[in-house]
Structures are given as C-alpha cells and as structure tokens.
Amino acid sequence: MQAAFSYGHWQGRRLDNRSAVDSCDLPVGFPLEEAAAFNQGNPLTSVIGPQGFLVFENAPHLTVILYAYYEDARSFSCGRCTPCRMGTVLIAEALKNAVEGRGSTVDWDEIAETARHMKVSSLCGIGLQSAEPILGAIENFRAELETTEPVAGLQGLKDAKQYVSTATAPCIEACPAHVNVPRYIDYIRDGRPEMAEGVLLKRYPLVGTCGRVCVRPCEAACARRFNEQPIAIRDLKRHAADELGVGSAELFDDAMLKHPAPGVDPNQRIAVIGAGPAGIVCAYHLLRLGRPVDVFEMEQEAGGMARWGIPSYRLPRAELAGETDIVKTLGGHYRYGEKLGRDFHLNDLLAQGYDAVFLGIGCARGQFLGPPDEDQNAQGYLRGLDFLLEVEHSQGTPEGPKPLEGDVVVIGCGNVAMDCCRTARRIVKPGCQVTVAYRRIEASAPADPEEIHAARAEGIRFEFLSAPKRILVENGRVVGIELVRMHQTEPDASGRRAVKPLPGSEFIIPCSYVIAAIGQKMDPTVFIPEDGIALTRWGTIETKENFTTSREGVFAGGDAATGPKTLILAMAQGEAAAKSIDQYLKTREPAFFPRTRLSQIIAKAKLVGACRPTRPLPIEARYTSKFLDPEARSANWEEVEGAMTIEEARQESQRCMRCMRLIAVTTRNPVVEHEPTAPNAATF
C-alpha cells in the first residue's frame, strides 16, 4: 500500500498532484511504500531533508512542517560559521511569521538569498544541505508561505508527537549504535576528551574497548574517503578514553545513581544472562534508569568474547575490566560461575521474582571443519574459540600458555581466525610456521584488512583459494592437512563469483595442529523445553524487532539472536533491548523505536547517500597508527597498537567535514515512542 502523494519539491523537481485527478507527478528515488506506515496504522504526512520535501494527504500546513524543520536546523547548527548560524535563525523566524499568519510581510526573495548563501558558504553539512527545502518552497509554492491566516503552530505538531527528526551523517547511519561521531570528534578537536567520552557513554560504557577492536563500519561510510582516506574514527574514540586515564566505571558518582527515572518501579528486578557486550550494555542502561539488575556469567570475569576471545595484545585486560566494572558502580551485581542450563533454568529465575530476563549468551561454540572421516578427538585438532579460551585461561597461571610444538594451520580468514593465528604465533616453538588457509580470495576475507596486514607482518603465511579436504591423523595425532586449490567462477547475475575445487590440485601441508576458525554458533543445550524459547533454523534465538522472544518477559540480543556478528552491533542491541524491557515493565506493551524506523526510511530512500564533498578539499594524510616492531611483539602479549598523541588527535579530528544532514518526517497520528532518559544524566 502506498501513501497518497500530494505535492513537493524533490531533487530539484516541482511535483504537484493536487491540480488534476489523473496527475502522475511522483517523486523519483523515494519509495512511496515507506510512507504508508511509520509505525502500525500511522502513515507519513511529510518527509523533509536535503533532497527537498514531500507532502502527503492529511498533512499539516507546509509552513508548519518547514518551521519545525528549521527550528531543528537552528538547534543543530554548530555555530562555527555565519551563513549557517545566522541563516537558520533568519529562515526559522520568517517561517514563524508565516505560521502566525504574517507570511505576506516576509521578504521571501531575501530569505531565498540567505538560503543560497548557506548552501555554498557553510562550513558543515547542516548549513550546506538544509537550504534545499526552503528554496524549493519559495520557488514553487510561495503562495503557501504568504498565508495571511494563522495555522497550527510548531509546538502543536511536536507536542502531539507527530514529528520525528534526526541530525545524521553517513558515519552515524553506518554505526549500529548510531553514535554521534561528528560530535565527539568536535570535542576532541577542541581538546575536551571528557565531553567526547560523554557522547559515547550515552550509547555504551565500553568506550576504550570499542576504540580498540571495533570493525569500523563508520569509517567505511566516511565521506572523506572520496578525497583521500576516511577519518581514523576508531583511533579518535580510543584517544578519548585513553586521555581520561580511567575506566568508564570511575566517571559516575553516587549522586547520579540513586534516583529512578519517572515511571520506574525500583522493586522490579531484571536478570541479565551473559556478561558479554550485549549483556553489559543492557544492564548499563537499565541500571541508569534505576532498575535493579543481576548479571549471571558462567566465567569468573565479565566481558564475554571481548574478554575470552580477543587476545590481550589487541585489548588489554585492565582496560576491559575498568569498563565492565560499570555494572557494579551503578549498583548492579555480577553472579560469576553461574551458567544457564547447568546451574539454573529460566523458570528458576522467574520463580525467584525476576520480572524480566535478557539473554545475551553469545555464540561461544566453535565448529569443526566436517570433512569425511573427521576425527574430532585427534590430538592437535582444535576449534578456534576453544583454542583462544584455553590460552586466555592459562594466562593467569604460573606456567602460562602451553607452547605449541610444531607447525600450525588455521582454517578460515575472519577476525577469529586472525586472533587464532596471531595467538599461535606467540606460543609456537621457534622455527615453527603458522599458516592461514582460506577458500576464497583475500578481498573476500571477512577479517579486518588491518588484522591480515598485522598477521603478515608477524610472519604468518597465507594460502588463499585453498579449501580443506581431509585432516591427516596418525596414532591419534594430527600430522598434516590436505587442501585443494579453488578457482573463481564467472560472475553470476548479481556479480558474485563462486569458488569451485580445481581437479587434481590437492596438496598437503605437514603440521601438528589444525585450528578450525570457520564460525561459531550458540550452544542450544543451555535451554530445556520448559524454557519455551524458540530457535531459528540457524540455531539462534528467535526474536522480534523489539527483542522479545517466544516467552513473555524474556528478551534476547547480540550474537545469540543474530549469529556471530560484531561487538558494536551487540552493544547496540543491548541498548535497544534495555529500552524494550523498560517499556514492557511499565506498560506490558511492545516497544517501538522511532529512531530505528527513521533509519530504515533513510536507508531505503537513500536520504544520506554517499555524501561526496561538494567543494574541493586539500589532500590531508590520514593518521598513521603506530605499532610495536613485528618481530618483538610476536614474542609477547603487550598491546601492539600505540595511542594517538594529543596533537595527532587534534590534527586528525580537523579532517572531519561534519557532513551532517537533517531529516524529518511528520505522521498522521502520534508516534508512541520509547526513549527513556536516565535521571540526572549529563547531556553531551
């Protein structure tokens, strides 16, 4: 079903379906089906953004829509340049006059000239990109602006919750947590790392952790890549955390923690199962609302796969511990050594009086390769996660990790495979070789290219287009692996190229260890039928968009719901699940996330797009990360990557183009949103 389009100005075109019944003016590039419902039974009445504006049937008056938009533009302007700082004010004031019935007294030609100056002279995207709607309205629908009758005002629209907006950018939309990247970069440029950290703490407490191991989807979307290279966003995030010199747990004081948010019943208890990124972030947001939380963790330390699956040369243990302690700082409790399915079941928790449960149990079970006649008990044949866990647990013993006495072959080329091969390199006997074999080409490898580069620098060999055929075992011990060369097929209709074995190309790599790092899955044995938890055909927990499961009061997120993904996605889902749990405990109604829905519209309508620079920019080299010498670092567990200096961070932050875009929609009915605000929380 499509919404009935009325009129608008979109991508430089005047569109008007009001004058004739059979008019066929339709916006090009905007999927009208997205306007049919913002949330259930609630169609859009307008869309406004850098491309212009679209008005659908039963919409507010155009002046009201524009006034709301430019009031937002004024508040989102960084204020660093006159065209945007003053232009948004002048446009908003003109539209206020129009809303109040004085549109005929406004010099709209002068307002158009102001908007044109904004469009070419502003320093950031708010000014550069927000001029188009008013220019289109003045050029094509001036009669609407010159109204002499007062119309429903801005506050009426916003108070009725029929207006949803966001100031966003490619990096923000690419980040699953929708972190305001340009804002924290601004603070770093201004020498205020504590404020930069504050921006990040609005989303998650694992700031230094994410600043070290995030897979950086924001950088892949950074508009600066069209000029030379993306901003070093992850390094800047780490800089903010490093400059403070303390973990996020030490940034909160008791005065901020003791008052529940409005509508919160402090007697309602929540159990979070799993102290990984999703569970910790879920607990963090619930605790900040004043809700009691207990976190059940089968290990003796918090962090989940960030603690046990990421080696300390990438993520120092003290850094992670200083951030996972936030749960205790905020009044929550860790219950270590308690595993779901072994020590308790869901019914036990509910019988103990917990009002809601969050399942953040991750995907901690590795997979074997599965070739014919595979001996999974062969000595030297390991699953990747088992190997990493064994090494991590042995780090705290006097003996340390057990040396690997022979060559090692790692199968797979994801980030877990990179952690496995680089960990093996640190404990293998001198003179032994570590090899990575992957069935596709290097460009198809899911691992971070930086990790592949670092592994190569440490002397690890790669065999691409090579797939395992059988593991060679003698007397119960691995002695080698047989691989077969693969070749790429011609691209299919979608452009994808498959790989197929090359007949007669088999070869053997003698080795004492084969580590299978080809993926992980959730351990289904933690559940019993009485738990009532439905699983997908992929073996993950079946959830809805609001993170509810098949059992009332039980929610799930992170890898347990998505399959093995990324730390940043797990944290984003932990935050969203906390909001959903909060809504459930207040009303027993399902939660709806307006910002998430707006992001879906932004993506499908390509409202942000590639954001190529509109003006020539000087070539400015990206910050170059500093690493320990490969030969020296491969013999120890010290953190490999160094930190930015204050001056390096300042210079890198100045490369940010702040390519923000303001996008808004109005709806026919109120949007029932759920965005709880923690009491006494600082605003950044």
Segments and roles (model prediction):
Residues 177-179, 189, 193-259, 328, ...:
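Glycine/serine-rich phosphate-binding loop and adjoining beta1-alpha1 elements at the start
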Residues 241-263, 325-342, 366-427, 535-550:
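Glycine-rich dinucleotide-binding loop and its adjacent helix/turn
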Residues 377-405, 471, 491-564, 611-613:
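FAD-site-proximal beta/loop scaffold in flavoenzymes
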Residues 560-591:
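A conserved FAD-binding loop/helix module that cradles the flavin
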